[in-house]
């Protein structure tokens, strides 16, 4: 089993799809990586040699922000929005939808379980 960026890639999958198991790499990025390294898209992970795995890992390390570093960057970006106190930061702080969705009826995922107000 190939291990790249701390992620075990599934053996039987094609390399272009297996690379998408790494947080921060989608299908387009994985194809760009394989093209740059010169590996066929049709190759399966268990068919890769150690040299090919190391060249893929090297390309990812020097060109992409993945896994823990990317998660940390996203968290820091959200934290900076909240510290600035702008509209998006306030929405993040309150746990409401950030991108303009209305909250009159839905937004249950973001707002959580409904809090009922007791009546007499």
Curated annotation (Swiss-Prot):
Q: Which UniProt keywords apply?
A: Ribonucleoprotein, Ribosomal protein, RNA-binding, rRNA-binding, tRNA-binding
Matches recorded under Pfam families: Ribosomal_S13
**Superkingdom of origin:** Bacteria
Q: Which GO terms describe its molecular function?
A: rRNA binding; structural constituent of ribosome; tRNA binding
Q: Which GO terms describe its cellular component?
A: cytosol; small ribosomal subunit
What is one Gene Ontology biological process annotated in the Swiss-Prot or TrEMBL record?
translation
Please give the positions of the paired cysteines in each disulfide bond.
none
**UniProt cross-references to InterPro entries, sorted A to Z:** Rbsml_uS13_C (IPR027437), Ribosomal_uS13 (IPR001892), Ribosomal_uS13-like_H2TH (IPR010979), Ribosomal_uS13_bac-type (IPR019980), Ribosomal_uS13_CS (IPR018269)
UniProt function note: Located at the top of the head of the 30S subunit, it contacts several helices of the 16S rRNA. In the 70S ribosome it contacts the 23S rRNA (bridge B1a) and protein L5 of the 50S subunit (bridge B1b), connecting the 2 subunits; these bridges are implicated in subunit movement. Contacts the tRNAs in the A and P-sites.
What does the subunit section of this Swiss-Prot or TrEMBL entry state? Answer: Part of the 30S ribosomal subunit. Forms a loose heterodimer with protein S19. Forms two bridges to the 50S subunit in the 70S ribosome.
Per the record, the similarity remark reads: Belongs to the universal ribosomal protein uS13 family.
The entry's protein name is Small ribosomal subunit protein uS13
Species source reads Helicobacter pylori (strain G27)
